[in-house]
Amino acid sequence: GLGGRLDATNSVAHPVLCIITSISLEHTEILGDTIAQIAGEKAGIIKTGVPVVFDANESEAAAVIADRARELHSPCTALEKKMYRMLEFKNNFIDFSLSTAYDKETRWTIPGAADYQVENAALAILAMRILQQQYPSAFSGDSFEQQLHSGMKAAFWPGRMQEIAPEIYFDGAHNTSGIGMFTEAVKRLT
């Protein structure tokens, strides 16, 4: 979908959490031709008082999203590049560390070879931590932690850096930024 205000998922009237992934130039004929305009459209999913977690690695987009969250009195948590780092890439798995208000330098493993997969996984983990704070009885205990770690390790993103045959990868990247990240990931494998 288009993401944001115009996305079909925005029909959920009372979400428990809003998540905005990285923003780059895409669908410019509909969303606008600047990062700020696109971020404004993406921020259209934010609902009054509903927590929002977002990728803040593009500063112009982050400012727009944070401003919109403030306008709507929505608690806002930003994922910044300094909060995670890739530790090791081995056998099509990435080990990375994540340091947030909820996780102090925890180690995670995900399948894949692309940096954007680390960003997306870190954002998903941060989102789960926020839900854990909101609903502690539903998301607590050692078994939850084990499930979260094993779920991340078993994650599969169809059409994103997907190996469709030995040493042949497919990625549905549809903008310049995504294609660049895919190219970097392929270089890492060769």
Where would I find each of the regions flagged by the language model?
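Nucleotide phosphate-binding/pyrophosphate-handling subdomain across enzymes
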Residues: 6-19, 23-24, 28, 37, ...
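Acidic, Mg2+-coordinating active-site environments of NTP-dependent enzymes
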Residues: 15, 19-108, 121, 125-143
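Short beta->alpha linker loops
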Residues: 1, 56-60, 156, 174
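Short acidic loop-to-helix transition motifs that present clustered carboxylates
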Residues: 2-5, 83-84
